[in-house]
Structures are given as structure tokens and as C-alpha cells.
Design a protein with these regions (language model features):
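Membrane-embedded alpha-helical bundles that constitute the cytochrome b-like, heme-associated redox core
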Residues: 1-332
Length: 332
């Protein structure tokens, strides 16, 4: 009995109707394979890639994706302690002044919480070290990925190297973070470092000290705190949105007006629903940031900023601190 015909089907036998199920894919930049730094896309992609060969053995070496995993984990978990600090600071510098409508009354609540977040050891543990780790891990992670892109895809000309380097690939979330670094540094300089240099500590620094600074230079401090609070709140809210999977401030752009000729037939049936969901998330996240920044500024500028000048020896001490501030002391 002749054996059955086991040859492959001819071209004419192929069900041409299956071609309808093919999807039209838009071209995307090669750098998107690595995901965004802020939302840790690359962690999941690297972990989903199976190991070469038949055996799956634990890798203890510091390979590329392991570097990404560790750096992304540091960048993510280093945001937890500062979030607790900023929540407490938000209550002390905005909510409580808004409720008491008085700087001296709000100062009493600040004194109650001072041992929790202003002691040298605890403050560095929940604020200084995590923020430094967060910024450093982000810088190292971007350099690792930019060098990998240059190695994999080539960067021979100056324009090619520029397109694969550190700065052009930054998302809005990352740009807000790097804008926040000098703003936060100035805040630490005026409220921590200078009092430590002049008085040996910041025990005399409180809401009255900040209100005294507003009287000395109202234009500078109003503009500074307006930018500082807006950038800080947007970065924190946008960062937590990214951790939760709500990508609002990433570099990827949805293609709304660039629909292909076969869209709606080749796998794009849910595109409109996805875009509506993205717009809804955008409004929610940015709405939370607007409300948070507005409340914080209402307490900081509306109550503390109008608290008035200090009196007696305390005002003289504060004047000496502001006069000793380096670089920006002439504006204060």
C-alpha cells in the first residue's frame, strides 16, 4: 500500500482567507525595545526572555538585563521613603496652616512632628540617601542603555551618536526629576546647610523662618516655591502613576491621526477604546497633580508667605542666616 503523501501543501492549497488576520504594524524606534526607564518596562521584557539552551540555570553574573533589573529596582523602591516624608511635609506646610490660618499655631504642630522627620539620622535615612540613590540609579541606567543601543545598532556618525545618547531620550517625567534636583538643593541649602553653618543646627528653622524670608524677598520666594511645588508634585504624582502602570508622562506618543488605510480591519478594532482610556488616565493623573499643587501652594504662599516678619533676636538670627546663603544670598 503506497504511503500517504506527507509533503507540504502547495501554494494553491493555502487558505488565502488567513491573510485577513494579518496585522499592519507601524514602524517604531529601535530604542523602544528597551522600554522606558520610569515605568520599568525593560525588567519584564528581560525576565520573559528564555535562557539559551535546554537548561534553565540561575545566572549570578552581572549581565546587561541584570544591571537593568537592579537599577530599576533601586530607582523604584528608593521612592517609597521620600513619599512618606513628602506626605508628612505636605501636612505640616500646607494642610495644617490652611486649617489653623496662622503661622504660630501651625508651628506648634511642626514642633510635634520634628523628631520624626527632622532628626539627623532619620532624615538622612528616609530622604537624603533614597533621593541620592534614585537620581544616581537613573543616571547610570540611562548611560547603560544608551551604550547598549550604540553597541547593538551602531553609532558611526555624530548625528547617530547624538540620537543614542543620554539627554535626547529623556521623557517628561525624567526631565521634571532633573529639574527638581537644583530646586530641592536650594531648599536644603537655605533650610538645612546654612543654619548648620551659622547656628550649628536647624532647630531654630521653622515656618516663621520661611515667612521671614518671604518678607525679605517676596518676588524671589513666590516664584521659587511656585516652580518648586509644581515640578515636585507633578514628578511625584507622575512617578507613582508610572509605577502603577498609568503611563502619562512617558516618551511614547500614541498615533491618533496617523491611521493606516486598512485600520479597523487588520487588528485595530480596539484602538479607539484604548485612546479613550489613555485620555481618561491623562486627565485623572494630571488632575490629581493640579489639585495637589494648588492645595500645597495655597498653604505655602497664602498662609506662610503672608505670615510676616519675625521679631526680636529671632529675626536678627534669621537675617544672619539669609545673609550667609552662598550663590543666591544676594537675592534673598
Amino acid at each position: 500500500m503506497p504511503p500517504q503523501d506527507l509533503s507540504l501543501p502547495k501554494v494553491d492549497d493555502v487558505d488565502t482567507r488567513s491573510l485577513i488576520s494579518m496585522q499592519e504594524l507601524d514602524p517604531s524606534p529601535v530604542s523602544e525595545e528597551f522600554g522606558d526607564i520610569e515605568n520599568s518596562d525593560f525588567i519584564h521584557k528581560a525576565q520573559d526572555v528564555p535562557a539559551h539552551g535546554g537548561l534553565s540555570l540561575p545566572k549570578l553574573g552581572l549581565r546587561g538585563h541584570n544591571w537593568d533589573s537592579w537599577l530599576c529596582a533601586i530607582q523604584r523602591f528608593s521612592t517609597y521613603p521620600p513619599t512618606l516624608f513628602f506626605t508628612l511635609h505636605f501636612a505640616n506646610t500646607s494642610l495644617i496652616p490652611l486649617m489653623t490660618r496662622s503661622v504660630p499655631a501651625a508651628e506648634n504642630y511642626l514642633l510635634l512632628t520634628r523628631p520624626l522627620y527632622q532628626s539627623p539620622s532619620l532624615e538622612h535615612a528616609i530622604l537624603t540617601v533614597p533621593i541620592l540613590a534614585h537620581v544616581a540609579s537613573g543616571i547610570v541606567l540611562r548611560n547603560v542603555r544608551s551604550s547598549r543601543r550604540a553597541r547593538l545598532y551602531g553609532a558611526e556618525t555624530r548625528s547617530q551618536r547624538y540620537s543614542l545618547t543620554f539627554w535626547p531620550r529623556m521623557t517628561l517625567q525624567a526631565r521634571l526629576g532633573y529639574m527638581l534636583v537644583p530646586l530641592l538643593g536650594a531648599h536644603v541649602l537655605v533650610n538645612r546647610i546654612v543654619p548648620l553653618m551659622v547656628d550649628g543646627g536647624s532647630s531654630g528653622v521653622g515656618l516663621g523662618y520661611v515667612a521671614h524670608g518671604f518678607v525679605r524677598s517676596p518676588v524671589f520666594w513666590n516664584i521659587y516655591y511656585l516652580i518648586f511645588v509644581a515640578v515636585g508634585v507633578w514628578h511625584i504624582v507622575g512617578g507613582w502613576a508610572n509605577w502603577m502602570g498609568w503611563r502619562v508622562t512617558t516618551a511614547r506618543k500614541e498615533r491618533i491621526n496617523k491611521k493606516g488605510s486598512l485600520e479597523g480591519y487588520l487588528g485595530y478594532t480596539d484602538s479607539e477604546h484604548r485612546m479613550r482610556k489613555q485620555r481618561k488616565i491623562w486627565w485623572i493623573v494630571n488632575g490629581i497633580a493640579v489639585v495637589g499643587a494648588s492645595i500645597w501652594l495655597a498653604g505655602a504662599l497664602g498662609i506662610i508667605g503672608l505670615g510676616g516678619r519675625g521679631s526680636g533676636w529671632e529675626a536678627s538670627s534669621w537675617d544672619g542666616m539669609y545673609d550667609r546663603v552662598p550663590i543666591i544670598g544676594a537675592w534673598l
